[in-house]
């Protein structure tokens, strides 16, 4: 559900960028705008304090995010369904 919302929002943003760039009179503007949007050189991701689905973990430690548990068999965070 969240993924479909994200994809819809990303599609709308991309549509807006393309529409705005096509209306621009400068020929270099679309290329500059897209290069700034998709530039990953300056992007430094924030590290989370917990591990998400599929991340490796150590059983017995509380490393996984809420609603996830460290699988003692596979040694990665999985969805905790409770018992």
Curated annotation (Swiss-Prot):
Q: Name one GO cellular component term.
A: extracellular region
Q: Which residues carry this modification: Leucine amide?
A: 81
Instruction: Share what the entry says about its subunit structure, partners included.
Output: Monomer.
- State one Pfam family annotation: Toxin_12
Question: Has the keyword tRNA processing been applied to this entry?
Answer: no
Expressed in which tissues? Expressed by the venom gland.
- Say what the protein does: Selective antagonist of neuronal tetrodotoxin (TTX)-sensitive voltage-gated sodium channels (IC(50)=1270 nM on Nav1.1/SCN1A, 270 nM on Nav1.2/SCN2A, 491 nM on Nav1.3/SCN3A and 232 nM on Nav1.7/SCN9A). This toxin suppress Nav1.7 current amplitude without significantly altering the activation, inactivation, and repriming kinetics. Short extreme depolarizations partially activate the toxin-bound channel, indicating voltage-dependent inhibition of this toxin. This toxin increases the deactivation of the Nav1.7 current after extreme depolarizations.
- UniProt main location, coarse: secreted
Which UniProt keywords are given for this protein, alphabetically ordered?
Answer: Amidation, Disulfide bond, Ion channel impairing toxin, Knottin, Neurotoxin, Presynaptic neurotoxin, Secreted, Signal, Toxin, Voltage-gated sodium channel impairing toxin
Annotated source species: Cyriopagopus hainanus (Chinese bird spider)
As given in the record, the signal peptide range reads 1-21
Question: What are this entry's molecular-function GO terms?
Answer: ion channel inhibitor activity; sodium channel regulator activity; toxin activity
| Record-stated family | Belongs to the neurotoxin 10 (Hwtx-1) family. 15 (Hntx-3) subfamily.
Query: What domain of life does the UniProt record list for this protein's source?
Result: Eukaryota
Q: What domain notes does the record hold?
A: The presence of a 'disulfide through disulfide knot' structurally defines this protein as a knottin.
Compartment annotation:
Secreted
Record's protein name: Hainantoxin-III 5
Q: What else is known?
A: Negative results: has no activity on Nav1.4, Nav1.5, Nav1.8 and Nav1.9 sodium and calcium currents.
* Cystine connections: 50-65, 57-70, 64-77
Task: Give the propeptide segment as residue ranges.
Answer: 22-48
């Amino acid at each position: 559900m969240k993924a479909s919302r994200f994809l819809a929002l990303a599609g709308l943003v991309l549509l807006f960028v393309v529409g705005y760039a096509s209306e621009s009179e400068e020929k270099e503007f679309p290329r500059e705008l897209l290069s700034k949007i998709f530039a990953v050189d300056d992007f430094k991701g924030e590290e989370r304090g917990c591990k998400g689905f599929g991340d490796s973990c150590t059983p017995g430690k509380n490393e996984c995010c809420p609603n996830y548990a460290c699988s003692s068999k596979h040694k990665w965070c999985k969805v905790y369904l409770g018992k």
